[in-house]
Amino acid sequence: GTTSRGLGDVYKRQEFNLRGAMSAAHQVKPDIAIQIDLMLATDTPETHDYGEMELGKGPGMSLFSFHGRGTLNGVIPHPSLVDLMEQSADLKNIKLQRSAQVGVLTDLSYIQQLGNGVASIDMGFPMRNSHSSLEICNINDLVSLEVLLETALSNITSEFSLIRS
């Protein structure tokens, strides 16, 4: 089962060393972790071979990420959280894009391994030109992501199950 301790915000420094959220997670001991970040848009001629994430087509959900170098790992999301996000998107008529990328790493890669494991999922919005002075996103994707997350979080109650079937 799931124990509900309430929801809260934890702010951290991802770009520092990709382990910024681990300190907070050790203290909070979460059952669920949702990483919110950009998702690399692949809707330009030079990026279309790297995926199917487009600006203006809704928020994104990562179904697989892996850094691909050394001991850096990635995330395969918990099935209950995938279902929750899909159901929430359907409920609000939000287009939900799916992503699977190599070369991507977030703090969630480490948080998911704490204790007996933390149910995890990476959510985000498509962005072009990451880490440049010309980052581009579609404001409607951000608004839809906000609505999606509000809806999903409101459905994480004491009855929400993290048991894998």
Regions found by a protein language model. Name each.
Residues 60-146, 152-165:
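Active-site-adjacent substrate-binding region
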Residues 4, 25-28, 53-54, 113-116:
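Solvent-exposed alpha-helices and their adjacent loops that cap or buttress functional pockets
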Residues 18-22, 44-49, 109-110, 133-134:
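Short, well-ordered secondary-structure micro-motifs
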Residues 12-17, 38-40, 127-129:
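Acidic, glycine-rich active-site loops and adjacent beta-strand->loop/helix elements
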Residues 12-19, 101-105:
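Active-site glycine- and acidic-residue-rich loops that bind
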Residues 25-45:
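A glycine-rich helix N-cap at a beta->alpha junction
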Residues 23-27, 46-61:
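Short, surface-exposed, charged loop/turn segments at secondary-structure junctions
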